[in-house]
């Protein structure tokens, strides 16, 4: 449901109404010496981007982009005034406010003091609702403009934000459900929240506040499970949060239970969205609940079949039917191996996954202060963080897709200032015989974390607070004693480019649906890939950093179209130590994309005859330094006609 706010400006030009989309990613505004002449809007609807343009494209262009979908526009402002010789008002300037508390530069004309020129206006939803579309009037210029904002549907149960009036208002809207919640703290307050919503087969993230300490997360088994209750406390700011689900599970308490308590809960409803206020912390939090769908009626029982005539006696020589085959035994559950270390801190338990792809280790003054684990589950990437990150940063250990961790050497010690032993160092060993460097300070007391059966490490548990006190693990039986249980048909082609940035690896999927390439001043600033796994579209992480220069998209006609080759260039640029990728071009079984970026430097091509590309890996920092691919054989079905 949406709220159409009246347009501001003049009454000439032709009326337009873009309607309602899922969100706005980018706005480009053009101006001449008098007024705003042109607006171009990039909308998103069901995972696809659509462009709408109004006015006449002339004069100087300026762009404003949001960190979509995490960030969204919550207010549309600007100014309008009568233009000499035109006989009516025109839009003189535009500006936008977002859910991150940001305000765009003034796009258009300003006074000598830097304010919008003309009569100012600000259009926003009552509760910080998301901008979903524009309407207005235009011709040779932009005569008038108004927004469509998200509005609470009457069928929803809306809980107004509880807390203070600081920060900026935001409203994520209503989705199909909630997949995951991440909560970060800064001292005794909740400073950051990130919600991963479900919309059809897609995951839509929205983040609010300022990330300080490493966030903790609560994962919902969507669509089989939903959140039924949100409980928290307010002590000036949001101080704690707790969630209860339809399966009777209750999350840990995120934060400190101090201040006044609130509960969002409605019988036969489920949580589908959040709203609130935030700046440096979460000032207030509200929620949207939707009614549960009516249960599907049980089918009417089929009529009983007529009794069959009695069979004639079988001849004595009739063969005895073979016994039914014995069903294959269910896979053995993972083995939970006890945590090694001290007794301090708070218990955490990530559970078991399909694979551990990467481990990040952060050092403190006395030992391991922080760990982050990157898991794979049903083709999806999930992360868990524990401890507290320090200014000393993190190091990482990456596990190849056809390898797995078999054991960990854990060094522990009694350190002054801590009531029990803490973990001071970690060393990882894999099935392929790889041994990592020691992460931290090794001590005389070294313990080995393994299950004694050659199992594959698939999850972690332990104890942590400001440091890592203890670490344990889940080990799953391997399906083959000599070969890791990963697809043997995929090939990982070496990444090309410079040696800067941090390594990343999206892994192997069924195919690629869409590619987003962000431009920088001198090279490719970031890449994001949308993959397909089974019946789901999975949006990968952003690798690199978004800039104001915008994003270009290459969308495939999946599943009939697939990528066969990636070409590009990398080069040394001023001010960056390692070479960066300057251009990318994608070839499919049907066509070739435009070059994204500048074709300058060393040329490379990533392909394998008879293979298609189903995943990407590489290195990135503020720019993309390297890119490589995962490829699998192309299987074609043939039909013989006689």
Swiss-Prot record:
GO terms for cellular component: thioglucosidase complex. GO terms for molecular function: carbohydrate binding; thioglucosidase binding. Induction: Not regulated by wounding, dehydration stress, methyl jasmonate, salicylic acid or abscisic acid treatments. Residues 296-334 have a biased composition (Pro residues). Residues 296-338, 479-499 are annotated as: Disordered. Residues 2-151, 156-291, 334-477, 490-633 form the Jacalin-type lectin domain. It holds the Pfam family Jacalin. One of its GO terms (biological process) is response to wounding. SUPFAM superfamilies: Mannose-binding lectins (SSF51101). It comes from the Eukaryota. Belongs to the jacalin lectin family. This is Myrosinase-binding protein 2. It comes from Arabidopsis thaliana (Mouse-ear cress).
């Amino acid at each position: 449901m949406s709220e159409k706010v009246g347009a501001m400006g003049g009454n000439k030009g032709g009326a337009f109404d873009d309607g309602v989309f899922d969100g706005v990613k980018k706005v480009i505004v053009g101006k001449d010496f008098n007024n705003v002449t042109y607006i171009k809007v990039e909308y998103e609807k069901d995972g696809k981007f659509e462009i709408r343009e109004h006015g006449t494209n002339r004069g100087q262009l300026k762009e404003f982009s949001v960190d979509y979908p995490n960030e969204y526009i919550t207010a549309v402002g600007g100014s309008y005034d009568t233009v000499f010789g035109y006989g009516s008002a025109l839009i003189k300037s535009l500006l936008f406010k977002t859910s991150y508390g940001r305000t765009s530069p003034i796009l258009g004309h300003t006074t000598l003091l830097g304010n919008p020129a003309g009569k100012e206006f600000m259009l926003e939803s009552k509760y910080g609702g998301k901008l979903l579309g524009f309407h207005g009037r235009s011709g040779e210029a932009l005569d008038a403009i108004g927004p469509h904002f998200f509005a609470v549907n009457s069928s929803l149960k809306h809980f107004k934000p509880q807390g203070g009036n600081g920060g900026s208002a935001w409203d994520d809207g209503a989705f199909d459900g909630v997949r995951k919640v991440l909560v970060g703290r800064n001292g005794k307050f909740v400073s950051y929240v990130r919600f991963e919503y479900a919309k059809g087969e897609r995951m839509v993230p929205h983040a609010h506040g300022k990330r300080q300490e490493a966030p903790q997360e609560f994962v919902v088994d969507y669509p089989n499970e939903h959140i039924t209750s949100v409980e928290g406390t307010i002590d000036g700011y949001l101080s704690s949060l707790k969630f209860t689900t339809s399966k009777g599970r209750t999350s840990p308490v995120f934060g400190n239970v101090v201040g006044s308590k609130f509960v969002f809960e409605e019988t036969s409803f489920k949580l589908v969205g959040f709203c609130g206020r935030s700046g440096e912390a979460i000032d207030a939090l509200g929620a949207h609940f939707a009614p549960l769908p009516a249960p599907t009626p049980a089918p009417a029982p089929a009529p009983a079949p007529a009794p069959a005539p009695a069979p004639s006696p079988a001849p004595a020589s009739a063969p005895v039917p073979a016994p039914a085959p014995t069903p294959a035994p269910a896979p053995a559950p993972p083995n939970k191996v006890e945590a090694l270390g001290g007794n301090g801190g708070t218990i955490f338990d990530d559970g078991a996954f399909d694979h551990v792809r990467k481990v990040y280790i952060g050092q403190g003054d006395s030992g391991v202060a922080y760990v982050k684990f990157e898991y794979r589950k049903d083709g999806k990437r999930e992360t868990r963080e524990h401890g507290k990150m320090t200014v000393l940063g993190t190091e990482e250990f990456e596990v190849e897709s056809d390898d797995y961790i078999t054991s960990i050497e854990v060094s522990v010690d009694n350190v002054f200032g801590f009531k029990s032993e803490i973990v001071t160092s970690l060393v990882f060993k894999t099935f392929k015989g790889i041994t990592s460097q020691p992460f931290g300070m090794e001590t005389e007391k070294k313990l080995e974390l393994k299950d004694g059966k050659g199992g594959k490490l698939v999850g972690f548990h332990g104890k942590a607070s400001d440091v890592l006190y203890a670490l344990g693990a889940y080990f799953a039986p391997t399906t083959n004693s000599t070969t890791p249980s990963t697809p043997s048909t995929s090939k990982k082609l070496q990444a090309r480019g410079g040696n800067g940035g941090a390594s990343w690896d999206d892994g192997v999927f069924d195919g690629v649906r869409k590619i987003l390439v962000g431009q920088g001043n001198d090279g490719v600033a970031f890449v994001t890939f949308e993959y397909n796994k089974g019946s789901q579209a999975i949006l990968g992480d952003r690798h690199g950093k978004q800039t104001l220069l915008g994003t270009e998209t290459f969308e495939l006609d999946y599943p009939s179209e697939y990528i066969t080759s990636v070409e590009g260039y990398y080069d040394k640029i001023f001010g960056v130590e390692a070479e960066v990728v300057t251009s990318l071009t994608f070839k499919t079984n049907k066509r070739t994309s435009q070059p994204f970026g500048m074709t300058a430097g060393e040329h490379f091509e990533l392909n394998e005859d008879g293979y298609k590309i189903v995943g990407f890996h590489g290195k990135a920092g503020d720019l993309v330094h390297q890119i490589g691919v995962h490829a699998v054989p192309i299987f074609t079905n043939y039909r013989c006609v006689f």
